[in-house]
């Protein structure tokens, strides 16, 4: 998702590393039986911290002093974009869909429970992110970020395919059918960008 927000590929990999570590940490905490909402907050906290550390590393003097080939691979012109994308694995898309579906099917009580669950997930996620931003002393980094599509469509197509297949693996989608989701992601993102550009 980071590329879809306008970052470069180096920042995309930084966001992916942070998200993978946060996801694995949350999964491990779930396996040992700790509170699910606390696990979401901890996963969001560590994913955000790691994304911030990688972004700061990419702009540090340590990277600038490396040989040119290494520095060009590690430096990013968009070090803040991973902070926006590293916790998207926690967004409760399925619970939101289930909430709306239950309410529309007149299963009001179940819908309310699922809606409250969704609010708690989002609150835990936001808590982890806010604590990480406070710990790092990050100012309002979004004031200078452009979210307008500016990459070629083929770049967005690749990023959309990777994103769609990545989310599908979270829900144990059959690997042989991932190409279908990749095509769906490509169509959705490129349509969104076409509409945004006018």
Go through each PLM region and give its residues:
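Alpha-helical transmembrane segments and their membrane-interface boundaries
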Residues: 1-198
């Amino acid at each position: 998702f980071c590329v879809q927000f306008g970052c470069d590929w180096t920042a995309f990999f930084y966001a992916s590393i942070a998200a993978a570590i946060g996801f694995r940490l949350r999964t491990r905490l779930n396996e040992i039986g700790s509170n699910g909402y606390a696990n979401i907050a901890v996963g969001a906290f560590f994913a955000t911290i790691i994304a911030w550390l990688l972004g700061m590393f990419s702009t540090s003097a340590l990277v600038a002093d490396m040989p040119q080939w290494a520095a060009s691979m590690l430096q990013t012109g968009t070090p803040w974009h991973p902070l926006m994308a590293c916790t998207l694995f926690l967004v409760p898309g399925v619970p939101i869909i289930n909430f709306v579906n239950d309410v529309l099917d007149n299963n009001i009580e179940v819908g309310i429970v699922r809606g409250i669950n969704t609010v708690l997930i989002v609150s835990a996620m936001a808590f982890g992110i806010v604590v990480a931003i406070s710990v790092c002393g990050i100012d309002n980094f979004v004031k200078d970020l452009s979210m307008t599509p500016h990459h070629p469509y083929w770049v967005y197509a690749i990023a959309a395919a990777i994103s769609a297949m990545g989310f599908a693996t979270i829900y144990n989608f059959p690997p042989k059918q991932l190409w279908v989701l990749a095509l769906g992601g490509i169509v959705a993102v490129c349509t969104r960008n076409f509409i945004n550009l006018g």
